[in-house]
Regions:
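Active-site anion-handling motifs in enzyme catalytic cores
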Residues: 1-204
């Protein structure tokens, strides 16, 4: 990639649920509002990447319309992005839940990021009050977490877990959807041509 970016966001923004779309767009929007250029990092892979099977997902159609997106890199090659992005932001979702992200190696612990590049997690989650993973995988993950410049988590219970069990200082922060002004998601909702009846939504 020839273009350089201030920040690369790594997460599961390509997932097929609207919650992920809203979360990652809000994170992207918040960082862009800081005056930073942002690259959304495509799904890393260990084996064969089946791009065709993902091509028509509504999440990818949305992403292509709103983001700059990196190519999909094998986990052995994703380190090339160190020359593209100055900093890497991980989050926000259950990216440290072993059963969710084990297929990506340790990419979601930013193991590929060089020492000179900033490494930040924002509202990342273990999905439980314990870090459940095979011992060898866990120790490498903890080593990667200790290399990060800043660690924050979505659930308060994970603050205590990080500090008492893993020896990592973590901060409890808001989900990205609560960082943005009301027009952030309102503007993209207005892009839809679907006709829906008025209703009331509650976010808890």
């Amino acid at each position: 990639m020839k273009k350089k970016y201030d920040v690369g966001i790594l997460g599961v923004w390509f997932g097929c649920n609207y919650g992920s779309i809203a979360t990652y767009y809000s994170l992207y929007y918040a960082i862009k509002n800081m005056g930073k250029s942002v690259l959304m990092i495509h799904r890393p892979y260990l084996d064969h990447f089946e791009e065709a099977s993902m091509e028509d997902r509504h999440s990818l159609r949305f992403a292509r319309a709103h983001y700059d997106i990196s190519p999909a890199y094998h986990v052995d090659e994703i380190g090339k992005l160190n020359d593209v992005c100055d900093a890497f932001v991980l989050g926000a979702d259950q990216l440290w839940k072993y059963n969710v992200t084990k297929i990506f190696g340790h990419s979601y612990f930013l193991d590929f990021v060089n020492r000179k590049n900033k490494k930040i997690s924002y509202a990342t989650s273990f999905g439980t009050d314990r870090f459940k993973a095979p011992k060898e995988y866990m120790w490498k993950a903890v080593k990667c977490l200790r290399r990060m410049n800043y660690v924050s988590v979505r659930e308060k219970v994970n603050v205590n877990m990080c500090e008492k069990l893993l020896g990592i200082r973590a901060e409890h922060v808001l989900d990205p959807v609560l960082l943005c002004e009301s027009n952030c998601l309102g503007d993209i909702a207005n892009e839809s041509d679907r006709k829906v009846k008025l209703h009331c939504s509650l976010y808890t």
